Amino acid sequence: MRAMQTHTEIAPMPIPGHVDPVPVPREVTPREDGRIDLIGLPRKQIAELFAQAGLDAKAAKLRAKQVFHWLYHRGVTDFDAMTDIAKTMRPWLAERFVIGRPEIVEAQVSTDGTRKWLLRTADKHDFEMVFIPDADRGTLCVSSQVGCTLNCRFCHTGTMRLVRNLTPGEIVGQVMLARDALGEWPKGANDSRVATMAGLDFDDEDEGSYTSDGRLLTNIVMMGMGEPLYNFDNVRDALKLVMDGDGLALSKRRITLSTSGVVPMMERCGEEIGVNLAVSLHAVTKDVRDEIVPINRKYGIEELLQACADYPGASNARRITFEYVMLKDKNDSDDHARELVRLIRQYKLPAKVNLIPFNPWPGAPYECSSPDRIKSFANIVFEAGISAPVRTPRGRDIDAACGQLKTASERKSRAELDRLAEEKLAALG
């Protein structure tokens, strides 16, 4: 890169490399009241904060254990609800700390039951999360960044600029909010008002079925806004809390992290997080993948597939998922399908392929492949002995489907969203 430009043309943003895997143009703005949000912090750090605030080491460790339990097992958002902590201690905690959640700006429900939330950070940046209910599972699609830097051509999020990384608290806070909305904390831990604010029609008759034993939220996919491996430390720390047996206690086998191919971070992902891996492949030739997934210009298909072959823990029991969006006349021919099979076999990958019908958005430069073309592609892969299900689009009517996140916040002005949020709060009393 030149040290100085002598003309007014703006140079394109370079694709970040392994030297700086977290390209962040903006830092998190501290809370105005100076209090520290405990959500997203491990027990050890909570104990250290309590000690710094004046508790002796033994008391700090005990209080941290108690608070951690109330945060992640009970889902409370108020220190006064922590009944095994002395009443005199609760105001002391409330003066210094806060139990945060991302602010809910808007909640939408699709005709197919998919739910999408437009959320806002404490420093006023918007992002989205999606809950997808199925007959045998409920999957939460979690965001890792506000915006994205990868510029994948078929993805609406890719047209956004990257604002900043989400913190561990903002990432795990999405899971907490979903549990609020689904009533998945032990009965009585939170009231129905929280669920109503989160966009769920909740009444006393529902309370018996919406419990943690009901497991409405069973799976997490890091497939929302952003590239998780460009926010590796924060994603890792958040998922450790989600998987902690004393935390949210979700098995790593029920968590999938999706990457567009940040090769230098993939091994660390397997070693330090250990969750299932999904790779946004989307093309099998250099020219096409260079166009639609520009990070391919830095980490090519062969390098990416070798990293998949080396991924810790990958096996026939824990296959790597390749995501493949079906784009008309771009990556959907029978020859493309046969090349996909060849590559998977060449690298001896324990893999399955999710074929994703392209979900349109305003101004998108591509169209979805026809149903017959998708079927032909899928049959070639399936007949080679590789699972190749065609994903049923979910939440298209509320722009919550794969590749559509961004639209809700673009359609409405910030002022209109603020007005709607105020009206909702006023209606709740």
Swiss-Prot record:
The keyword 4Fe-4S applies. Residues 1-23 are annotated as: Disordered. Disulfide bonds join 141-402. Binds 1 [4Fe-4S] cluster. The cluster is coordinated with 3 cysteines and an exchangeable S-adenosyl-L-methionine. It is an enzyme of class 2 (transferase). S-adenosyl-L-methionine binds at residues 226-227, 258, 280-282, 359. Residues 134-397 form the Radical SAM core domain. GO terms for cellular component: cytoplasm. Belongs to the radical SAM superfamily. RlmN family. Reaction proceeds by a ping-pong mechanism involving intermediate methylation of a conserved cysteine residue. This is Dual-specificity RNA methyltransferase RlmN. The gene is rlmN.
